[in-house]
Amino acid sequence: MKALHFGAGNIGRGFIGKLLADAGIQLTFADVNQVVLDALNARHSYQVHVVGENEQVDTVSGVNAVSSIGDDVVDLIAHVDLITTAVGPVVLERIAPAIAKGLAKRKAQGVDAPLNIIACENMVRGTTQLKGHVMNALADGDKAWVEQHVGFVDSAVDRIVPPSASATHDPLEVTVETFSEWIVDKTQFKGALPNIPGMELTDNLMAFVERKLFTLNTGHAITAYLGKLAGHQTIRDAILDESIRAVVKGAMEESGAVLIKRYGFDADKHAAYIQKILGRFENPYLKDDVERVGRQPLRKLSAGDRLIKPLLGTLEYGLPHVNLVKGIAAAMHFRSDEDPQAQELAALITEKGPQAALAQISGLDANSDVVAEAVNAYNATK
């Protein structure tokens, strides 16, 4: 089996690329970073530091690399069995034209074997969004063939991969946590379902997408925002602060009550899942900076994201949300000289006040009780 993976960054090498290579799949990375491409093609291997209770160093070998903006990547698409991505949500649109060219070439060469494409991004239904970009880039005469022969498979991914500690070290070395989860929608594949250790197949993807969003992402963000306010540097430092931990755990329990009501998750198993995530936040080997985790607060306060979406669920089912509201208030206080969204958020609050600003960002009714609760919490943490 041959696979092409877009994105040779830390997540690509440390998570999805590693799983594919470990499964014995012939893997080629596509990226724009020439330093990384040259290193991969010189060595055809790299090391992954897996950190946790049992630290180990794994070697990933037998890999190649091509530029994601050249003809080589188009040629590869015509012949591979699987395409995956870990490029970041905003970059999906940029790689779509190359994928479209490769699919057109595949059709022209009469390669009718099924091809499956899986976007492994921190977003909901990312592959469906990628499909839209690819379809827009295709000629009308190629679209029906693509619908017939190419599966666009949505997925949910979960593994903490912090940025490299130093810019001067080996460009291929990467550190990841022990935990990883890659859940894919088995109803969207073309051809036989793949057997890749570490890939979990489901016919109820949205339950797992929201479980991750409402638990890991919600908890991670609130830990970062409360941690920044309290002067902590890392997620570990913040979650070891008992006052922060109580709010984070409470928020995950509130969002968990929504998941249990909506999808029928087992309450005891979900409580264990929350405990596992708190343990991941405590990992002393992951130097996860609160400022990095907190960046892009406007996106994280939007209606479909990790803070407002679970809150809307509590309103839908008439469930408590006091800790989620505290997390939202902390997010409104997030300031960072390195993050344009943090600066935009601050300017919006200065211009319109917290009530109107939150309503504009989140889509919540400015006159609702829950916005009043958030504004009270915001003012209480000044």
From Swiss-Prot:
EC numbers for this chain: 1.1.1.17
Membrane-crossing segments per the record: none
Name of this chain's protein: Mannitol-1-phosphate 5-dehydrogenase
Organism: Salmonella enteritidis PT4 (strain P125109)
Catalyzed reaction equations: D-mannitol 1-phosphate + NAD(+) = beta-D-fructose 6-phosphate + NADH + H(+)
Keyword field contains Transferase: no
Enzyme class: oxidoreductase
Any one GO cellular component localisation term in the record: cytosol
PANTHER family in the record: ALTRONATE OXIDOREDUCTASE-RELATED, MANNITOL-1-PHOSPHATE 5-DEHYDROGENASE
Pfam family for this entry, one: Mannitol_dh
Underlying gene: mtlD
Lineage: Bacteria, Pseudomonadati, Pseudomonadota, Gammaproteobacteria, Enterobacterales
Cross-referenced SUPFAM superfamilies: 6-phosphogluconate dehydrogenase C-terminal domain-like, NAD(P)-binding Rossmann-fold domains
Domain of life where this protein originates: Bacteria
Keyword Lipid biosynthesis in record: no
